[in-house]
């Protein structure tokens, strides 16, 4: 890629220039932090002075940097569209109670934080909000409302907060200045989009290698949209000095508000800048940009346009009475209270289903436990089996993704199969490069740093002497031709300048292609499938190279630096001990102790056409990438005889006839592709039987999902979902994770008889095999956090698709391979499109409720795990998620997390209507406050 050569030739980055100048000019402060620290997740800048104090002994640059860092906390990172991560758009406010966070979001971004009255009314009338639960919740929060009057109050806009306090309508008072704001935005956006382009532009912005601040100066002087370019021609060398110079005209008491307003004016673009600085990609190394440089450009533009910064101290967004700030008193908006009742209604149903299933299995499980002991002293009882005394036909491990719940249920119904749930990166934090990929990807959650580099290479290098070599040659010829065509089309289609006249300039040939995709998408799918089938499967021609020798890399990975990551110093491959640890961790977290003849790790990916948000449908645990590579790596590890030997020393005895395979579940079509090249002849019948049953499961799952997509049960389900996958005009190829509402952590037997409607994340866990609680802690700090991100993204994209989502797909345009905007310009959109959450304009599909988590374990064990997990308890205490424990040591009784590591027994209410709660860590009953 272009970034490689640019990165090597670049002599001085913007960050280096800014840091050196700061050290020269800011001698009064000992901190040498770079501007990258102003984004969330970076090290904070320590200060000893109050920045709001006008004491001039405190360096202006120091104060500016503090304010930038503080403002950046409210703008979460925005991942590029090619690897879009569904994250919480209000992640910067998770240290606040939910109702205060949405009020802050309304003030800063103008976004609605709660469903509107029509949504609540529909949920109430359809039973999604139970009337009795709503009544109890309204009483609990001390309102004067009945259920009917509460819904009516929202509809009329006369809501009151809890505690019988009414709010005061707030406004920003800056409506007259909205044009000034737009004048700055449209100029800075023009140069941001040019600078941050990730390979789609035919002509690059000049001087990008010098950094955004310098590049902006070089072009702004020729920008006819800027009336007074003299103010930009000779600015300070360091952008921090430029910011301080502009701010010097204002009292220091106003600096914080001015900086926050400028940083949050375009949260999409600033979120992308934060992503770049936090992840230090090759694009960032080659073309550096910081929030300080961006802020300097904005402020210089305001100066050149003669726009006073104190007149645009906040975006022109009004804040409704339902989202007012409650900073001084602990009150709850009525929407919050009704939302809680909605969530409790769902949670009650989920807990009842799980508890009933747990009770039904209890005696069966006890019987199986005794039966297992008679099989042999070396056989452990298996918690996740329907019948542990019968060896399963196969065991399949899926991602915890809600879409896996549907296919798992249908697979289990076709035979003696066991399915498990595990994070879709299968516990291996790697940077992965496929056999024919030009760049590598981080195949791990965004909250986890990659630890290893793994690349694929050809199984047989001598293509003239081996069948696999012939496969490689044919594969590469076809793939090169295909990729060349795709690159040309993508370059034209994704460039704003060329997109609108693309079809005209490419002539009738492309028009025929568009017509075929529009009129005959099923035929197109069939043709593409036949072409794909002529190519050898990737597992036939290549395999992941796990050896630590750096020489074993593919033809594309001869450089340490690739097009996606800079100066990559990650070690190649995995040591033997690392392989053992990753395999053992997977089995221990899932509670998998006994094995069938075939054990499969099934990643997942999507298949869509003309979909900028396609990566949002891929595996979130793989950072918006396909999960197949992660599955292949873990399967290869587990088939290693040396690894199996070491696992036996740890009490994990894998039978000699157990074979591990990998696969990939295409969630759009529910097709599961198995990678079976390494399967011995002795297991071919097992594989054929499994593949036949997977085809049956696909048909059943497709029929179930199609009903929710179209409601038409008369069409062929397989044909229709294949059409959706190939139809370039299809705005809703699948629902993705829409509908997600719950997360169950426990053995499959809790839910195997329950239709969870594809709304629940399922992570396998056996508390009896987790003596130290470390497995539970790993699940709570990893998968739970990721699912909360996903849930929050869907929630906010549903309640305000214009601010927290991305509006309609029909009017979206891609920008420089980094994002999308509505129409022909503006801020980068930060969330999912309306088609991902709504059936129609007036008909929601996704129910906007927060995540209800259920853990099957002793409440004391969960309390112990939470005690040191501040990041998790913060989400719980601030009502971003809820937690219920089903305690198997107490006859599967349920306990709801209250606050401060305290619990209330199910049936005794949740908070205010209960007089006592238990504190398991001290094994006694203690008095609890009402909150």
Swiss-Prot record:
Keywords assigned: Cell membrane, Membrane, Metal-binding, Transport, Zinc
Domain of life: Archaea
Region annotation (Disordered) ranges: 1-57, 360-390
Main location: membrane
Keyword Transport appears in the UniProt entry: yes
Subcellular compartments: Cell membrane
Molecular function terms from GO: zinc ion binding
Function: Part of an energy-coupled inorganic carbon pump.
Name assigned to this protein: Probable inorganic carbon transporter subunit DabA
Species per Swiss-Prot/TrEMBL record: Haloquadratum walsbyi (strain DSM 16790 / HBSQ001)
High-level lineage: Archaea, Methanobacteriati, Methanobacteriota, Stenosarchaea group, Halobacteria
Gene name for this UniProt entry: dabA
């Amino acid at each position: 890629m272009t970034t490689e050569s640019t990165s090597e030739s670049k002599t001085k980055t913007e960050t280096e220039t800014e840091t050196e100048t700061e050290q020269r000019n800011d001698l009064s402060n000992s901190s040498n932090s770079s501007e990258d620290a102003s984004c969330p997740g970076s090290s904070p800048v320590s200060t000893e002075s109050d920045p709001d104090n006008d004491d001039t002994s405190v360096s202006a640059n120091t104060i500016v940097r503090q304010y930038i860092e503080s403002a950046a906390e409210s703008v979460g990172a925005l991942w590029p569209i090619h690897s879009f991560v569904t994250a919480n758009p209000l992640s910067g406010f998770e240290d606040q109670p939910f109702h205060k966070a949405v009020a802050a979001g309304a003030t800063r971004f103008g976004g609605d934080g709660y469903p509107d009255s029509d949504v609540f009314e529909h949920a109430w009338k359809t039973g999604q909000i139970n009337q009795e639960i709503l009544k109890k919740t309204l009483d609990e929060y001390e309102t004067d409302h009945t259920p009917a009057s509460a819904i009516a109050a929202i509809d009329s806009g006369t809501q009151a907060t809890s505690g019988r306090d009414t709010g005061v309508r707030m406004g920003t008072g800056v409506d007259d200045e909205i044009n000034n704001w737009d004048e700055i935005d449209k100029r800075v956006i023009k140069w941001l989009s040019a600078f941050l382009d990730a390979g789609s532009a035919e002509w690059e912005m000049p001087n990008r290698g010098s950094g955004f601040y310098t590049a902006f100066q070089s072009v702004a002087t020729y920008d006819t949209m800027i009336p007074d370019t003299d103010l930009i021609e000779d600015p300070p060398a360091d952008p921090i000095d430029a910011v301080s110079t502009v701010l010097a005209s204002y009292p220091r008491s106003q600096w914080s508000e001015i900086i926050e307003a400028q940083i949050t004016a375009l949260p999409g673009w600033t979120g992308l800048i934060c992503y770049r600085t936090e992840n230090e990609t090759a694009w960032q190394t080659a073309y550096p940009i910081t929030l300080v440089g961006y802020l300097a450009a904005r402020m210089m533009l305001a100066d050149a346009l003669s726009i006073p910064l104190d007149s645009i101290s906040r975006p022109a967004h009004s804040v409704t009475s339902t989202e007012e700030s409650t900073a001084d008193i602990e009150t709850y908006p009525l929407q919050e209270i009704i939302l809680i009742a909605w969530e409790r209604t769902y949670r009650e149903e989920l807990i009842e289903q799980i508890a009933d299933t747990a009770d039904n299995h209890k005696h069966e499980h006890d019987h199986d436990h005794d039966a297992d002991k008679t099989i042999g002293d070396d056989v452990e009882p298996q918690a996740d089996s329907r019948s542990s005394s019968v060896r399963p036909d196969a065991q399949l491990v899926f991602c915890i993704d809600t879409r896996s719940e549907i296919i798992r249920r249908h697979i289990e119904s076709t035979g003696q199969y066991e399915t498990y749930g595990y994070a879709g990166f299968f516990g291996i934090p790697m940077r992965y490069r496929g056999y024919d990929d030009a760049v590598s990807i981080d195949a791990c959650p965004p909250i986890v740093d990659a630890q290893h580099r793994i690349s694929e290479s050809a199984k047989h290098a001598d293509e003239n002497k081996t069948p696999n070599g012939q496969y490689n040659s044919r594969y590469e010829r076809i793939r090169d031709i295909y990729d060349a065509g795709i690159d040309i089309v993508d370059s034209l289609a994704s460039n704003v300048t060329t997109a609108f006249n693309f079809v005209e300039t490419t002539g009738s040939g492309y028009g025929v292609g568009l017509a075929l995709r529009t009129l005959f998408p099923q035929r197109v799918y069939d043709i593409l499938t036949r072409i794909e089938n002529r190519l050898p499967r990737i597992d036939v021609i290549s395999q992941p190279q796990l050896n630590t020798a750096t020489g074993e890399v593919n033809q594309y990975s001869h450089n340490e630096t690739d097009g996606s990551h800079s100066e990559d110093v990650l070690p190649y491959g995995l040591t033997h001990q690392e392989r053992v640890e990753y395999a053992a961790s997977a089995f221990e977290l899932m509670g998998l102790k006994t094995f069938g003849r075939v054990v499969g790790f099934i990643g997942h990916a999507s298949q869509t056409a003309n979909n900028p948000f396609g990566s949002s449908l891929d595996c979130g645990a793989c950072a918006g990438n396909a999960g197949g590579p992660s599955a292949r790596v873990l399967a290869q590890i587990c088939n290693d005889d040396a690894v199996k030997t070491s696992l036996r020393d740890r009490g994990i005895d894998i039978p000699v006839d157990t074979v591990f395979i990998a696969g990939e579940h295409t969630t759009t079509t529910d097709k599961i592709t198995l990678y079976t090249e390494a399967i011995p002849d002795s297991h071919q019948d097992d594989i054929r039987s499994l593949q036949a049953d997977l085809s049956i499961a696909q048909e059943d799952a497709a029929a179930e999902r199609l009903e929710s997509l179209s409601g038409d049960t008369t069409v062929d389900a397989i044909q229709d979902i294949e059409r959706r996958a190939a139809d370039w005009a299809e705005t809703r190829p699948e629902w993705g994770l829409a509908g997600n509402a719950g997360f169950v952590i426990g053995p499959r037997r809790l839910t195997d008889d329950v239709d969870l409607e594809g709304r629940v994340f399922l992570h396998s866990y056996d508390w009896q095999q987790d003596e130290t609680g470390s497995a539970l802690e790993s699940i709570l700090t990893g998968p739970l956090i990721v699912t909360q991100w996903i849930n929050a993204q869907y929630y906010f994209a549903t309640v305000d698709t214009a601010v927290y989502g991305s509006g309609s797909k029909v009017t979206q345009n891609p920008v420089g391979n980094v994002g999308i905007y509505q129409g022909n310009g503006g801020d980068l959109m930060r969330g999912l499109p309306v088609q991902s959450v709504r059936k129609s304009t007036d008909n929601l599909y996704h129910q906007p409720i927060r995540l209800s988590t259920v853990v099957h374990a002793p409440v004391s064990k969960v309390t112990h795990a939470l005690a040191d997990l501040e990041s998790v308890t913060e989400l719980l205490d601030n009502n971003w998620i809820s937690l219920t424990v089903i305690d198997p040591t107490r006859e599967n009784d349920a306990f709801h997390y209250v606050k401060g590591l305290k619990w209330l027994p199910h049936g005794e209410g949740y908070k205010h209507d209960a007089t006592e709660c238990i504190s398991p860590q001290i094994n006694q009953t203690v008095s609890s406050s009402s909150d």
